[in-house]
Regions:
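Short, hydrophobic/π-rich interface segment
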Residues: 36-64
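Short glycine-rich, basic-tinged beta-strand/loop micro-motifs
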Residues: 22-40
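C-terminal edge-of-domain segments
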Residues: 56-118
Length: 119
């Protein structure tokens, strides 16, 4: 299984291409991130890769997130240990098209929801 490291500076299109290639070849890829910005880039990369795979291979993806400890051997005195996130991305059979899952069909306003609940 290929292991990819993602930072806040990772280019989404390149990450998506790498994810798609690894899924086509091996059916699985591991993505490691530290920090919210890096996680954001990783999720965007998975979304774009999912489109690539749906368009040319009729494949979908599943994601299994887990917390992982990051090596603390380089921490200076007083620094806290860091926890990262590992995303295991696997090939999955397509059940819904990405448009059905991710597109917003109508705008929902908070006031409309609250009005419905109060009736």
């Amino acid at each position: 299984m290929q292991a990819l490291k993602v930072s806040s500076q990772t280019v989404i299109q390149k990450l998506a291409g790498s994810i798609a290639i690894n899924i086509r070849n091996d059916g699985i890829v591991s993505i490691t991130v530290v920090g919210a910005s890096a996680l954001n880039q990783a999720i965007k990369g998975i979304i774009v890769a999912r489109r690539f795979l749906k368009d040319d291979g009729n494949m979908d993806l599943s994601v299994q997130p887990t917390f992982i400890p990051i090596s603390t051997e380089f921490l200076k005195p007083g620094e806290q240990a860091v926890t990262g996130i590992k995303l295991i991305v696997k090939k999955a059979p397509i059940e819904e098209t990405p448009e059905e899952i991710s597109s917003v069909k109508q705008e929902t306003k908070v006031n409309d929801i609250l009005d419905t609940k109060n009736k």
